[in-house]
């Protein structure tokens, strides 16, 4: 895709299997993205440079996935005015609770929108990015509306199936 609007950054390549769900969702909606592995702790200069130059490169939203001491979203948010969506990656001794707290507990003035730990996180991060982009793109907004209608139909079908038993 030529029109890259979303930057997806993960703290480690071990996050890639989870992050692929965000990519699949963006692909479904035809939203262009780029992916990078950048560590907030091991390559902080790269993280800051990536974030500082994101807007001039045409990005509109950044998604940051990290586990453990998950400071990636905060570091990226500190260096840009673009919306940053954090995906806390489950794992380690605290099974993602540390990543959740590190992602969601940001100081005033440095917001990171945070989605769920686990498999819903990447999908919801991509959907939130699509909603943000949809505020300035009527076609994308309509496709998101259609997606929501499909979700309603699936629930109605499940209800009909269970209710008829």
Language model: regions and residue ranges:
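Short coil/turn connectors at secondary-structure junctions
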Residues: 2-5, 29-32, 57-60, 80-84, ...
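C-terminal binding/interaction regions
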Residues: 4, 10-17, 21, 97-165
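Glycine-rich phosphate/diphosphate-binding loop of Rossmann-like nucleotide-binding domains
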Residues: 4-42
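Short beta->alpha connector loops at strand-helix junctions that form conserved
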Residues: 10, 37, 66, 87-90, ...
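Short glycine/serine/threonine-rich phosphate/pyrophosphate-binding segments
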Residues: 15-20, 43-47, 66-75, 94-97, ...
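Short, solvent-exposed amphipathic alpha-helical segments in soluble enzyme
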Residues: 21-28, 52, 79-81, 130-131
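N-terminal beta-loop-helix "entrance" segment that forms/cooperates
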Residues: 35-56
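Glycine-rich phosphate-binding loop
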Residues: 50-92
